[in-house]
Curated annotation (Swiss-Prot):
Known catalytic reactions: orotidine 5'-phosphate + diphosphate = orotate + 5-phospho-alpha-D-ribose 1-diphosphate
Binding site for 5-phospho-alpha-D-ribose 1-diphosphate: E114, D115, V116, I117, T118, T119, G120, G121, S122
Job of this protein: Catalyzes the transfer of a ribosyl phosphate group from 5-phosphoribose 1-diphosphate to orotate, leading to the formation of orotidine monophosphate (OMP).
Cofactor: Mg(2+)
Protein name in UniProt: Orotate phosphoribosyltransferase
PANTHER family for the chain: OROTATE PHOSPHORIBOSYLTRANSFERASE, URIDINE 5'-MONOPHOSPHATE SYNTHASE
Recorded coiled-coil stretches: none
Underlying gene: pyrE
CDD domains to which the protein is assigned, alphabetical: PRTases_typeI
Length: 191
């Protein structure tokens, strides 16, 4: 898939939003990628996740893990394409962990996936969970990298779409200065 095909999917599904948004990272932005708008369409989910899977097909991936919520469908579909199992992490008392009797074997080769990264914070937490359980992270795959490649996760990272989107600290946000209310379209609570 080329960049234009990927952008076309995000545009057709209404997944690229403009306005004033509070991101999961706590930062503010004038653009938001609502990947759920894409992921509700199995034909697009399959196509995008197959492309991610192709980028890691020779890495010996044994398990794919994504953080709840956005990474669950991506993890499942990438794992299906690779013919391996899919797990997801969840927050428990504010800390990312594997629950539901999910486990990893020491040395298990894991691909971490996510729908969108801005700072890479959630993915970094998943990487730490994998390492703490003795797993080996072979890479990270994301649908959209809003950091324009600046999120350094310490492992090979593949993004289907890498974009540069303005982000602002809440204390220095021109959209707030204009009196525009910030909307929190994602699912994780900001503390």
């Amino acid at each position: 898939m080329n960049r234009e095909e990927i952008i076309d999917i995000f545009t057709k599904t209404g997944a690229m939003l403009s306005g004033h948004f509070r991101l999961t990272s706590g930062k503010h932005s004038n653009r938001y990628f609502q990947c759920a708008q894409v992921l509700q369409h199995p034909q697009y989910t399959q196509k995008l996740c197959q492309e991610l899977a192709n980028r890691f097909e020779n890495q010996g991936v044994q398990t794919v893990i994504g953080p709840a919520m956005g990474g669950i469908l991506v993890s499942y579909e990438v794992a299906r394409s690779l013919g391996v199992r899919s797990l997801f992490t969840e927050r428990e008392n504010g800390k990312m962990s594997l629950r539901r009797s999910f486990s990893l074997q020491p040395g298990e080769k894991v691909l971490v996936v996510e729908d969108v990264i801005t700072t890479g914070g959630s993915v970094a937490e998943v990487i730490e969970v994998v390492k703490s359980l003795g797993g080996e992270v072979v890479g990270v795959g994301v649908l959209v990298d809003r950091s324009n490649g600046k999120a350094n996760l310490g492992v090979r990272t593949e993004a289907l779409l890498t974009v540069s989107v303005e982000t602002y600290d809440p204390d220095n946000c021109p959209l707030c200065d204009q009196g525009l209310p910030a909307v929190k379209p994602g699912s994780r609570q900001i503390t």
